[in-house]
Amino acid sequence: MSTPDNHGKKAPQFAAFKPLTTVQNANDCCCDGACSSTPTLSENVSGTRYSWKVSGMDCAACARKVENAVRQLAGVNQVQVLFATEKLVVDADNDIRAQVESALQKAGYSLRDEQAAEEPQASRLKENLPLITLIVMMAISWGLEQFNHPFGQLAFIATTLVGLYPIARQALRLIKSGSYFAIETLMSVAAIGALFIGATAEAAMVLLLFLIGERLEGWAASRARQGVSALMALKPETATRLRKGEREEVAINSLRPGDVIEVAAGGRLPADGKLLSPFASFDESALTGESIPVERATGDKVPAGATSVDRLVTLEVLSEPGASAIDRILKLIEEAEERRAPIERFIDRFSRIYTPAIMAVALLVTLVPPLLFAASWQEWIYKGLTLLLIGCPCALVISTPAAITSGLAAAARRGALIKGGAALEQLGRVTQVAFDKTGTLTVGKPRVTAIHPATGISESELLTLAAAVEQGATHPLAQAIVREAQVAELAIPTAESQRALVGSGIEAQVNGERVLICAAGKHPADAFTGLINELESAGQTVVLVVRNDDVLGVIALQDTLRADAATAISELNALGVKGVILTGDNPRAAAAIAGELGLEFKAGLLPEDKVKAVTELNQHAPLAMVGDGINDAPAMKAAAIGIAMGSGTDVALETADAALTHNHLRGLVQMIELARATHANIRQNITIALGLKGIFLVTTLLGMTGLWLAVLADTGATVLVTANALRLLRRR
C-alpha cells in the first residue's frame, strides 16, 4: 500500500494485513491510510451533506481513521465512511469542505470529487517496489552478516530505517488526527526499541513481514469490493436515446422518465425501463442470481443492468438518475455498513481497551523484573517489545466484519439482499417463519376463474364495474380483475373518489353511483352464501361487487403456488424452522394452500391482526416475517427480521431487513443456512485470533518466541481469519 503525502504524491507505506469490511476501530487495526475522496452537496435534515469518493483504502481500519480525523472538526454533525463503496459522507451545519480536506491531508489521505474519473492505477512494479526493495536489502544484509558482522549490522540498521520512515511518518500523522494506538505506532515503537537493544536483524524482519501482510491486505480489500465493483459496472456510461426519429448518444445521467431508448443485442440497460418492443429475453443474472434468461412482453418492467439477450429492443425510461434498480441495491449495501451486528459492536468496545491494556502489560513486563528483581534490562525490554506487537488487534478486530461482509456478499450473489450485520445475525437465530400468502407463497398473479352476477346484470357489466373501481390499484387481485376486463376488450369507465378501506376493500364513484369491491364476509350477501362457501372450499378467493349497498355479484380468483414453495418448506423443516401462514384471505382459501404445504395458518387478518400474531409468535422464538405488500410492512417491522419478496411494493422493500430479488422461496433457506454458517465462522475467527494471541503471550514471557515470530503470528492470524471468512464466498 502507499500513503499520499501532503503534496498528493504516493510514499511507501507498510501496514499489516486486514480484510474486507468496515472494521470497528481504526486505532486498533493494522492498516495505513491511502484514502482519497469526493465532495458532492445535498440537503440533509441536519444541515448540508457533503460526500467524497475515497480511493486507496486497503482495509476498513482506513475508514475508521478517516472518520477519526474528520470527527474532531468543529461543526461536524455526523461522519460516515462506507468502505464497500469507498465513500465519505459528512453532515455539517456550515461549509467545511476545506477543513475536511485539510484535516485528511494532514492525516496522510487525499480526496477527490465524487463525479471525477477514477484515478489511474499504479503499475505493479511501482505498487510492489517497497516490498521488493526491502527484500533485496534484507538479502544483502544477511549476506554481509555472514562475512562481516559489523557491516551486516549496519546493513540491517539501514534496512530498518528505510522501512521505518514511512511508517513512523504515518504514525505521527495519525496521532495528530486522534488515532493514538494505530498499528503504525506500535510498529514504530517496536522497531526503534529493537534497534536500541541491538536486535537489528529482527527489527528489519519485523518490517518485512509487516509489508507482506500489507500486500495481503490489499488483495483482501479488492476481493471485498469485487461484488460492488461488478454491480457498478453493470450500467453503461452512455445510452442511445430516440428523439424525433433520430438516435443520439447521451450520458446516462441525462436520461429522464419518459425518454425512449434503444438497447442492442448484448447491450445492458442504462436505466429501469418499460419494454416497448413486442417481446424479448433478458439476462438478469447479475442482479437476481437467476441464471435462465427472463422472457418479457410489451409493457413489462426491466431493471437497469439487465442484458438484452438476442435482439435490439426499445424501452421507455422509468427511473430518475440515481434511482435505478442498481442504484437501490448500492444504497442497500451502504445502509448495510451502517447497521452493525451486536457482536461487531462488542468486539469494537473490546478492541478499544485491548491495545492500551496490552501496552500497559508490555510496559510492566519491561520495567518490573529489572527494577524489582535485578533482571537483565535487555532481555525484558526485548520481551516488552514483543508483547507490544502482540498488542496489535488486527485479527480480532476483523474477525467479525470479515465474516459478515463475506456472508452479505455471498447472499447478494444468490439474489438475496441483507441489510447489514445486525439483520444477518438475527437471521441466524430464526426458528420460525411467518408467510404472507398472496405474492409470497403464491406467484402473486391470480387469475379470474369465475364471474357470478346477480339477476338483471351481465357478467360483462359486473366485470366492467369491478375493473373501473380497481383500475390503478396495486393489489394482485385488483390487477387480475383489470387484466381480465382488458383481455375481454371491455370499455372501462373512469372511476372518481377512489378510496381504499383498510382491511375491507376499495370503493369509488362510477357513473355517479357508489361501487364497493370487498372480500366475502365484509358485506352481507345472503343470496350468494352457498356459492361463496363452495368457491372458498375449492381454495378460491371471492370478492363481492356492491353498488349502493346492493350485491351485484361475486368474482372468484385463484392464485398458484410458487414452483419451489413445497421444497422450500420441506428444507426449512429440515433446518428446524417452523412455518406458519398469516393472511388476510378467507380461511377456506388459506386452508387449501396450508394443507398443500403442511403449514399452520391464521386467516382473515387485518394488518393490525398480523402485527399482533407476529408479536405473539416472536415472544416464543425469533421469527422472520416474509411478505410483499403494504399490508405486510407493519408485521415485518414487528418481527425479529422482515424479509420482502423482490416483486413486492416499495413500502415492503423499504421496511424489510432483507429481500429476495429473484422471488425464489428456496433463497430463504439459503439465507438462513448462510447466516448460521456466518455465525459459526465468526466464532472460529475469534478463537483463532485470541487463541494465537494467548499462545504467543505465554511463549514470549517464557522466552520461547521473539519479535519476528510475534509479527508472523499477528500476520498469520489475520491471514487465517480472512481466508476462513472468504470460505463463505464459496458456499453453494
Curated annotation (Swiss-Prot):
GO BP terms in the entry: cadmium ion transmembrane transport; detoxification of zinc ion; intracellular zinc ion homeostasis; lead ion transport; metal ion transport; response to cadmium ion; response to lead ion; response to zinc ion
Positions contributing to Mg(2+) binding: 436, 438, 628
Gene Ontology CC terms, in alphabetical order: membrane; plasma membrane
Disruption phenotype: Mutant exhibits hypersensitivity to zinc, cadmium, lead and, to a lesser extent, cobalt and nickel.
EC code(s) of this entry: 7.2.2.-, 7.2.2.12, 7.2.2.21
Gene3D superfamilies per the UniProt record, alphabetical: 3.30.70.100, Calcium-transporting ATPase, cytoplasmic domain N (3.40.1110.10), Calcium-transporting ATPase, cytoplasmic transduction domain A (2.70.150.10), Calcium-transporting ATPase, transmembrane domain (1.20.1110.10), HAD superfamily/HAD-like (3.40.50.1000)
Keywords, alphabetical: ATP-binding, Cadmium, Cell inner membrane, Cell membrane, Ion transport, Lead, Magnesium, Membrane, Metal-binding, Nucleotide-binding, Phosphoprotein, Translocase, Transmembrane, Transmembrane helix, Transport, Zinc, Zinc transport
Effect on the protein upon substituting residue 394 to A: Lack of activity. Cannot bind metal at the transmembrane site. Lack of phosphorylation with ATP
Cellular localization per UniProt: Cell inner membrane
GO molecular function, one term: metal ion binding
Up-regulation conditions: Induced by zinc.
Catalysed reactions listed for this entry: Pb(2+)(in) + ATP + H2O = Pb(2+)(out) + ADP + phosphate + H(+); Zn(2+)(in) + ATP + H2O = Zn(2+)(out) + ADP + phosphate + H(+); Cd(2+)(in) + ATP + H2O = Cd(2+)(out) + ADP + phosphate + H(+)
Binding, Zn(2+) 2: 392, 394, 714
Membrane topology designation: Multi-pass membrane protein
Periplasmic side: 146, 198-202, 378-383, 703-707
Residues binding Zn(2+) 1: 58-59, 62
Listed transmembrane segments: 125-145, 147-167, 180-197, 203-222, 357-377, 384-404, 686-702, 708-729
Residues at the site labelled Important for metal transport: 693
NCBIfam families on file: ATPase-IB2_Cd, ATPase-IB_hvy, ATPase_P-type, P_type_ZntA, PRK11033.1
Name listed for the protein in its UniProt record: Zinc/cadmium/lead-transporting P-type ATPase
